[in-house]
Amino acid sequence: MKIKKALVIAALALCVQSASAQYNMPTQTFTYDKPYAVEKIKAPKGKKVKNVILMIGDGMSLMHVYTAWTANRGKLWLENATATGLSKTWATNKLVTDSGSGGTSLATGVKTNYHAVGVDTEGKPVPSLVDVAKELGKDAGIAVTCRLWDATPCDFCCHNIDRDKEEELVGDYPASGVNFVFGGGAEKFANRKDGRDIFNELRAKGYHVSRSLDDFFAYDTNSNIFAVPYDKDTPLPDERGDLLARASMKGIELMNRNKKGFFMMIEGSQLDDYGHFNQLDMLMK
């Protein structure tokens, strides 16, 4: 009996040590040496909205927003928003969602299974905001800092029951109807197991395929451009700087020529990665 009690006490001690070790992490701090300026924006009055820009911070929660607000001395461009709400994006078959299921909820308004991309719970494709824009005669585009086979961009342009079927997802882009695309992931567009060359298929559809930043920023013909200058993700924040902002502005410039307007999804894709890695400094950059 004494031995059993000793074993139980030892086991409890190990549990306590293990639990405390999980929270025995070094404190991280981050502050912008030079806070960026934030201006007050006034919405134009008396004009009908024709352009829609959806900006997604991958994996971003209210805590991320508050942390950024603190790091920038209590100022964020986000505070110019005239309304605040919460989007509940749980998966239909799992409490904790992922960018496949959660992003599909944002892109289509339809809840779906964990890891599903652009499909309902039965695996049937559902129309996204890209499709809605095209039906209205608008242009549609996406700009991301991740691989274009990653879940969020695919939620708007592709359809599959499993986000891990990366080559299959990339194979959906030529038929997606999206006009402007910027992101990484070139390695799965050519030299594929199925023998398809997605870049050539895009060219056959009338896209200008851009494989370098110089070519991308110099292009000025129309909005049908598929820019994939990187084999995988775009570079880390310190290296890429304001690349996402500049790429997004390029898309806006090209698609704004459509008199009926445009829809654009812009994703800060790498926030999620640094959240997983618990890297506060990279998360804030």
What residue spans do the PLM features occupy?
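Gly-rich Lys/Arg/Thr-decorated short loops/hinges at beta-loop-alpha junctions or inter-strand turns
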Residues: L106-Y114, F226-P237, D272-N278
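Active-site His/acidic residue clusters
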Residues: A151-C157, D231-T234, G251, N256-K285
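N-terminal catalytic scaffold of extracellular/periplasmic and nuclease hydrolases
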Residues: Q22-R192, I198-F216
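Sec/Tat signal peptide C-region and signal peptidase I cleavage site
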Residues: Q17-A21
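Hydrophobic helical h-region of N-terminal Sec-dependent signal peptides
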Residues: V8-V16
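Acidic-aromatic/histidine active-site loop/patch
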Residues: G185-N200, T221-N224, Y230-P237
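Bacterial N-terminal signal peptides that target proteins for export
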Residues: M1-V8
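A Trp-anchored, charged/polar loop motif used as the substrate-binding/catalytic surface
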Residues: H208-S212, G241-N256
